[in-house]
């Protein structure tokens, strides 16, 4: 799909966490092609290098190697960048960690770390971006949730907790920020073939389960997520807010 299918993002500045990851890279490249400036927050050096290679020759990419678990440092870094670029028009909260083990084996500290990175860091991003959005009278906030919120998953309690929290934040923010022309939506990806899958000990059995659950008999591709994020970030989605959109091949149906 062409990067400008839903209209140009030219002139928009996007704050995108986890922008160099398995699903982030494709979206970042599409948004750069559409004329956006992307502040890519990611601290994985190898993935950042791959993103920079993929974006070679395209203007607009700024990499911010910030630690999302350090909320104070994150806020300071984002406020500095916001002042330099004139504010963020679009926030995409995508970064997450994905531990897997039996619930009783998690320490409180481990569970709190998941919430800090998967939820609290996104809250900081929105708090930093919000003043500019309010003055502009428009804005887009997109939270990446997960198919796991719909149940049927074991050993992922803190991850599922964090992804359901993002749905609640999406609805609350959509109601509160709507008067300022700001839309807030969530996207719940299904099971995509990324590095996150490597936590599953039996990958063939895991993939078999995916095909049994999905209506569509193919694996999702990064472009499937990039396309919906491009749409929600664009003016074409200006009357959609407070929604959680599942992109999962028909795994969950409403």
Stretch-by-stretch model annotation:
Residues 1-6, 151, 230, 241-254:
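Short C-terminal tail/terminal secondary-structure segment
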Residues 20-21:
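Conserved glycine-rich cofactor-binding loop
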Residues 75, 97-112, 155-158, 198-202:
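Conserved mid-core segment of classical short-chain dehydrogenase/reductases
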Residues 97, 104-124, 142, 166, ...:
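Catalytic Tyr-X3-Lys loop
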Residues 126, 162, 170:
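Active-site helix of classical SDR
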Residues 131, 175-176, 238:
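Alpha-helical segment proximal to the catalytic Tyr-Lys
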Residues 146:
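Residue(s) in the substrate-gating loop at a strand-loop-helix junction
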Residues 178, 183, 240-242:
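Short, small/polar-rich loop/turn modules that mediate ligand/substrate recognition or access, typified
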């Amino acid at each position: 799909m062409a990067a400008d299918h839903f209209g140009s993002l030219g002139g928009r500045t996007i704050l995108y966490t986890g922008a160099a990851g398995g699903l982030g890279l494709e979206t970042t490249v599409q948004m750069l092609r559409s004329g956006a400036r992307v502040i890519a927050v990611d601290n994985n050096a190898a993935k950042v290098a791959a993103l920079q290679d993929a974006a070679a020759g395209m203007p607009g990419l700024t990499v911010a190697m910030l630690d999302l678990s350090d909320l104070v440092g994150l806020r300071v870094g984002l406020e500095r960048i916001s002042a330099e670029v004139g504010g963020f028009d679009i926030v995409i909260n995508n970064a997450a960690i994905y531990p897997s083990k039996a619930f009783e084996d998690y320490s409180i500290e481990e569970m709190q770390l998941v919430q800090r990175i998967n939820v609290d860091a996104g809250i900081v991003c929105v708090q930093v971006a919000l003043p500019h959005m309010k003055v502009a009278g428009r804005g887009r906030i997109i939270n990446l949730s997960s198919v796991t919120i719909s149940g049927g998953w074991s050993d992922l309690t803190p991850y599922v907790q964090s992804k359901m929290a993002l749905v609640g934040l999406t609805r609350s923010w959509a109601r509160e920020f709507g008067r300022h022309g700001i839309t807030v939506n969530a996207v719940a990806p299904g099971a995509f073939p990324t590095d996150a899958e490597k936590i599953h000990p039996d990958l063939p059995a895991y993939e078999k389960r995916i095909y049994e659950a999905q209506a569509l008999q193919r694996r999702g591709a990064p472009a499937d997520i990039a396309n919906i994020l491009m749409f929600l970030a664009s003016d074409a989605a200006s009357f959609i807010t407070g929604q959680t959109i599942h992109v999962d091949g028909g795994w969950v149906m409403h």
